Amino acid sequence: ATAGKVIKCKAAVCWGPKQPLSIEEIEVAPPKRHEVRVKIVATGICRSDDHVISGALSDMKFPVILGHEAAGVVESVGEGVTKFKPGDKVIPLFVPQCGECRCCKNPESNLCYKNDIGKYDGVLLDKTSRFTCKGKSIHNFISTSTFTEYTVLDEIAVAKIHEDAPLEKVCLIGCGFSTGYGSAVNTGKVKPGSTCAVFGLGGVGLSVIIGCKVAGASRIIGVDLNSDKFTTAKECGATECINPKDYNIPIHEVLAKMTDDGVDYAFEVIGNTTVMTSALSSSHFGCGKTVIVGLAPSSAVMSFDPLLILTGRILTGAVFGGWKSKDDVPKLVRDYLNKKFDFDPLITHYMPFEKINEGFELLRNGKSIRTILTF
C-alpha cells in the first residue's frame, strides 16, 4: 500500500556535531531506479556513529541520519531491481559491492569504489538523498542511514539474508561483528596455535577475539583500560586479560615478557594512533602482524620507527573485516544460524528507538557493549 508513495516516519536526525540526536518526523521518498526501500527492524549503536556526533569526523555534512549497522525488511523496490522483492529480509551494506570496479574484481580487496567512507558526500549514487525533514534535505550516512524507520539504499548496498534470521541479532553482521571477526580470519589470517593480543574490548574487539578463537589461536590476550570488560572478553574466548594501568612499564614490554618477545598477531580496535604504535611494537619483530581495525579521528597521524617494519613486522588493516559485503554477509548469517558463533555476549542492551540518546550515553560511559534499538 505504501509502494510508490512518500512515507512519513520517525528518525533520529543529527542536526550538527556535539548535540543530542533529535527524534523527528521525516519524509522518505520512494526508491528510484536500482534502489530499495527498507523498513528497519533493529539497528545497533556503533562507535563510528558517535565519532560523527562528537565532531571527530570533521568532513561530515549535516544534517544527517546516522546508523549503519542494521537489519530490516524490503518495503518496495525501484525500477530495474530484480534481486529483491517486498518482504525479503536484508542487511544494509556500508561497504557496497558493485561487482565492476577494480576492488570488486580483485579477490584480495573488498573496498568497492562506490563507497562513501572518508568522502562523506552524504548522498546515494545518483547524488541526491531520499530524506527530507521540515522542508530540508537530510544527508545519508555511508550508503546506509539506519536510525530511521525507513531508509532507501542503492541495490549494490543491500544483502538478502536467510528468512529464518533473527533480525535483532544478525543486525550485528552489518558492522561490528563482521568487522572484528573478519579482521582475525580474513585480514590477519590467524593461524592455529598462535598468540594474539587485542587492544580494545568493545563490541568489535570482542568479535576479533571470537575470530581468533574460531581460527584456533592458543593464546588470546585482551588489553583494555577498563577491567570491567574482562569477564565478557573471557566469555568470548580471551585466555587472559591485562590492564595497562596495572604496570609501570609500556604495555608492549609487558606483552613481550608474556609471549617470548612479542605476539604473532596484534589488533588495534580503538582508533587511537598511540595505541596503534603500541600494538605494532608488541608484535614479534621477525614475524608479527598488526591489524588496524579502529577508525581514528580525521586529522590523526600514526608515527613509529621504520626499523619496526624493516625487521619483518607487517602492518595492515581492512574496512568491514575484509568481507566482500554482498557475497559474504549472507554466508555469515548462515554461519550464525548454524551456531558457528554466538552474539549474546556482545549484546548488553535492547532499547526502544526513542531512547537512542541514552544508548549513546551507555557507550560513552563504558556501560554497554552493543545496544540494539528496535522499532
Curated annotation (Swiss-Prot):
Entry note: cofactor: Binds 2 Zn(2+) ions per subunit.
SUPFAM superfamilies, sorted: GroES-like, NAD(P)-binding Rossmann-fold domains
PROSITE patterns reported for this sequence: ADH_ZINC
Binding site for NAD(+): G200, L201, G202, G203, V204, G205, D224, K229, V293, G294, L295, R370
Record EC number: 1.1.1.1
Matching PANTHER family: ALCOHOL DEHYDROGENASE, ALCOHOL DEHYDROGENASE 1A
GO CC terms in record: cytosol
Keywords noted in UniProt: Acetylation, Cytoplasm, Metal-binding, NAD, Oxidoreductase, Zinc
Keyword Coiled coil carried by entry: no
Binding-site residues for Zn(2+) 1, renumbered to this chain: C46, H68, C175
Similarity comment: Belongs to the zinc-containing alcohol dehydrogenase family. Class-I subfamily.
Protein name: Alcohol dehydrogenase 1
GO MF, one annotated term: all-trans-retinol dehydrogenase (NAD+) activity
Primary subcellular site in the record, as a coarse category: cytoplasm
InterPro entries named among the record's database cross-references: ADH-like_C, ADH-like_N, ADH_Zn_CS, GroES-like_sf, NAD(P)-bd_dom_sf, PKS_ER
Gene Ontology biological-process annotations: retinoic acid metabolic process; retinol metabolic process
Catalytic activity: a primary alcohol + NAD(+) = an aldehyde + NADH + H(+); a secondary alcohol + NAD(+) = a ketone + NADH + H(+)
